Amino acid sequence: MANVIVIGAQWGDEGKGKITDLLSRSADVVVRYQGGVNAGHTIVVKGQTFKLHLIPSGILYPDTECMIGCGTVIDPQVLIKELDQLESLNISTKNLLISETAHVTMPYHRLIDKASEERRGSHKIGTTGRGIGPTYADKSERTGIRVLDLMDPAALRDQLAWTINNKNLILEKLYNLPPLDTEEVVKEYLGYAERLRPHVVDTSLKIYDAIQRRRNILFEGAQGTLLDLDHGTYPYVTSSNPVAGGACVGTGLGPTMIDRVIGVSKAYTTRVGEGPFPTELDGELGELLCDRGAEFGTTTGRKRRCGWFDAVIGRYAVRINGMDCMAITKLDVLDELEEIQVCIAYEIDGDRCDHFPTSARQFARCRPIYKTLPGWQVPTSECRTLEDLPQQALDYLKFLAELMEVPIAIVSLGASRDQTIIVEDPIHGPKRALLHPDGTPASLLSA
């Protein structure tokens, strides 16, 4: 039995969907613990592409129980569309469970999110406009609507009468938008409630029961460490906690019950939206990575900014999340390059900095210090073992592992399940030893 968290070690879009899908083969339960429809994951199975925003990746395995935890915010309209899409493809959704205490994104959340971003002008933060931030804001202000409220028509109508009255003041007076009709919103969301009712349970209790029965549980995060509300590049962050610690809060699980943490990083770095990005590449090289990596957002379709691998944020993600091992994705995107650069440290105002600065203003002044490695310039997408990789690619992976001081357990070389090298068992492998008895760093790349 193992309880494993999968987290993004960069700014999201690292390939967590594929890695979670792979690991779901060994999982009895897959749980999504934070975020909402502002994140998406793409899974390719036997040439068929699935794009999901709320439903956990494990839904493609018929015997795997999938849960949406209390730390997520749920847009019922999107969730029902995903259910309908899967069922139209004869994929069963009967094993999907939804936390009754998860908060619900309402129409006024989306309207306020978009209007607020437009009002920011040059100070925009790059929101997806899906209402995620305002939903979490209402949760913090204790005025939010939870899934269990949808199940009680009288309670929903009473709560929305007060809430929409207040939200209409904001929509009309601040943003010059038309008001919402309370009864129309109530009717719409009661319809959603009936469709979702069979899936709604106390997921925290279900998770605890699965642990008692010694089931393998996989906790799936959305976005990435550098988008974490507390530990990311604030204010250019999301409104929840994608880091490993968020899995406990977002599911109702005690921290002593977590066995392993697996981080996912691309072999280079990408970012969507606003905010500092020290290794960002402009010009032809950035375009090459974007084209070869198909770097367009699953949720918004926005073009992702591309850059070299940043080991400074990599080490930070290892530390913040207590990672036991890493999965490196999209190694094949680098196949054509003659040289590859890796950021090993920053220079800030003439001084070397080996650690991630907590100030976004200071981070914006960081200039990357690079180490240049030779490329391999041969295709790797058909490699299935470490021995199949060209030596330069293997050297590159070893260098990343040394810089981040964590083993690499999985190497992904394409979108399909079979385009993967499993270096060590990421679920049942050993806990990471920080140091050997003699004080030297622990094993870096298992082989």
From Swiss-Prot:
EC number assigned by the record = 6.3.4.4
Give this protein's Gene Ontology molecular function annotations: adenylosuccinate synthase activity; GTP binding; magnesium ion binding
Entry keyword Plastid: no
* Cofactor(s) the protein needs: Mg(2+)
Task: Please report any disulfide bonds recorded for this protein chain, giving both cysteine positions.
Answer: none
Annotated residues for binding of substrate: 298-304
Q: Where does it reside? A: Cytoplasm
Similarity section: Belongs to the adenylosuccinate synthetase family.
User: How is this protein named in the record?
Assistant: Adenylosuccinate synthetase
Name the gene that codes for it.
purA
